[in-house]
Amino acid sequence: MPEATDLEELKRGTDLVKRGFARMQKGGVIMDVVTREQARIAEDTGAVAVMALEAVPADIRKRGGVARMPDPENVTEIIDEVSIPVMGKSRIGHRKEAEILESLGVDMIDESEVLTPADDEYHTDKRDFASPFVCGARDLPEALRRIREGAAMIRTKGEAGTGDVNQAVKHQRTIKTQIRTLTGLNHEEREKWAREHGAPRDLVHETAEAGRLPVVNFAAGGIATPADAALMMYHGCDGIFVGSGIFGAEDPEAMGTAIVEAVNNWDDPDELADIASGIGKGMKGQSNEDLPDEEKLQGRGV
């Protein structure tokens, strides 16, 4: 039987284990939290994990400036507060933020376009870390590039902080359509597709043969209601990230519980109607169409 230190090494570090942890979150809701009190609410309403950050995306948009990783002390407080996994956001290409989060003991790192990118050319090489990473993607080539770098989970980018699910739907549909295209191509055509789209060839073949991404694929970016969450599950997502939609709502506890229940009952309209009733107003939101291009976050880190 392995020693305790061996068990710890087995628990973290390999691609198999990293992807395994990500798969354990399937069918669940991961909620953004800023404080330990919010983390407690998230756990009590049924979140499978929480994402620690310095401000929810809607507030990041309002205040402007440079958005960075959360205060390490705050991350530690959140870890101590809840029994569910705690994730943390780092800036794109900011290896040191990721290293700090790993040293704090977070269960997963989100290399996130919501924060101000530290590097306009390169993402962090996630293969060097013991902790699993999640990254956003708008299409299949982008998703496969992140997986090649070591991402254990992909999420739609959507347009975070808007409460408008439109772009999350677009990104998920795009990925699904491109996968369907690949499944109908022969080996040589897939090789050509990989070259033309800047996608890793081996992952292109793996995706085509499996008919899905090699890692779990969650929805994120603009999900603000139980119906939004159910819609993304209908479109084939493995789970849901909710950022501003919980604590930007009139009643965060009711909204959090309802979104969790909607994910569990996404294919039952009668149940969804009951779930969505009497939970108070959702976040105000902002239409993606009204955003100037320079304020859109989804184009960061391709």
From Swiss-Prot:
This is Pyridoxal 5'-phosphate synthase subunit PdxS. D-glyceraldehyde 3-phosphate binds at residue 173. The active site is at residue 89. D-ribose 5-phosphate binds at residues 32, 161, 222, 243-244. It catalyses: aldehydo-D-ribose 5-phosphate + D-glyceraldehyde 3-phosphate + L-glutamine = pyridoxal 5'-phosphate + L-glutamate + phosphate + 3 H2O + H(+). Catalyzes the formation of pyridoxal 5'-phosphate from ribose 5-phosphate (RBP), glyceraldehyde 3-phosphate (G3P) and ammonia. The ammonia is provided by the PdxT subunit. Can also use ribulose 5-phosphate and dihydroxyacetone phosphate as substrates, resulting from enzyme-catalyzed isomerization of RBP and G3P, respectively. GO terms for biological process: amino acid metabolic process; pyridoxal phosphate biosynthetic process; pyridoxine biosynthetic process. It holds the Pfam family SOR_SNZ. CDD domains: pdxS (cd04727). The gene is pdxS. It comes from Halorubrum lacusprofundi (strain ATCC 49239 / DSM 5036 / JCM 8891 / ACAM 34). It is an enzyme of class 4 (lyase). One of its GO terms (molecular function) is pyridoxal 5'-phosphate synthase (glutamine hydrolysing) activity. Residues 278-302 are annotated as: Disordered. Its EC number is 4.3.3.6. Keywords: Lyase, Pyridoxal phosphate, Schiff base. Pathway: Cofactor biosynthesis; pyridoxal 5'-phosphate biosynthesis. The keyword Nuclease does not apply. Belongs to the PdxS/SNZ family. InterPro entries: Aldolase_TIM (IPR013785), PdxS/SNZ (IPR001852), PdxS/SNZ_N (IPR033755), RibuloseP-bd_barrel (IPR011060). In the presence of PdxT, forms a dodecamer of heterodimers.
